[in-house]
């Protein structure tokens, strides 16, 4: 399984790069990468050029890719990560992919394990509302690779939702107030 962390958003409402906010004593991007690595994943991080030096400082010896057109949309950011994977992983074309938005760190280790074991496109849900991370199957990855960069992901895949008890599943770090709500 492959993994990509989407960290190329403009963070306009937050007023600072989401990937670099302090989260449990370290940059949020470092927190997420270390959690994913503890489950055997080697995430590719896709970010903006303006913060790449800071991201690389937080993540030495990790794979970090610059999205040269981050305003084109989330699918375009995901495509940047996919290109990196296809260029460096021996040309393997079919793989499952875990997609982790940097601003959605509220999933539990149990939820992550369920995603890693899943054999269908899926995402966790709490109280009937879908959350993140998102697990894509090879056919979903193929559709994303050939889509326009501004195509909404919801038009390219239809994840099955599985209910979880993660108290912070819907934590979405978009504003300074959201940082105060994080109790992960």
Language model features with spans:
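Conserved nucleotide-sugar donor-binding
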Residues: 131-142, 176
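Glycine- and other small-residue-rich loops at beta-strand/loop junctions that grip anionic moieties
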Residues: 100, 133, 171
């Amino acid at each position: 399984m492959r993994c990509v962390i989407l960290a190329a958003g403009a963070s306009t409402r937050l007023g600072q790069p989401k990937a670099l906010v302090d989260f449990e004593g370290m940059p949020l991007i470092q927190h997420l990468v270390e959690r994913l690595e503890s489950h055997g994943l080697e995430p590719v991080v896709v970010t903006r050029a303006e913060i790449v030096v800071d991201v690389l400082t937080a993540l030495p010896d990790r794979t970090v890719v610059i999205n040269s057109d981050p305003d084109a949309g989330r699918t375009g950011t995901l495509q940047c990560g996919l290109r990196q994977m296809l260029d460096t992983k021996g040309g393997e074309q079919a793989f499952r992919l875990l997609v982790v938005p940097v601003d959605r760190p509220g999933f539990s280790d149990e939820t992550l394990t369920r995603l890693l074991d899943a054999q269908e496109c899926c995402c966790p849900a709490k109280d009937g509302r879908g959350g993140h991370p998102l697990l894509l199957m090879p056919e979903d990855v193929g559709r994303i690779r050939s889509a326009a960069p501004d195509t909404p992901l919801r038009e390219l895949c239809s994840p099955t939702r599985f209910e979880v008890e993660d108290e912070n599943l819907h934590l979405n770090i978009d504003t300074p107030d959201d940082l105060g709500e994080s109790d992960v």
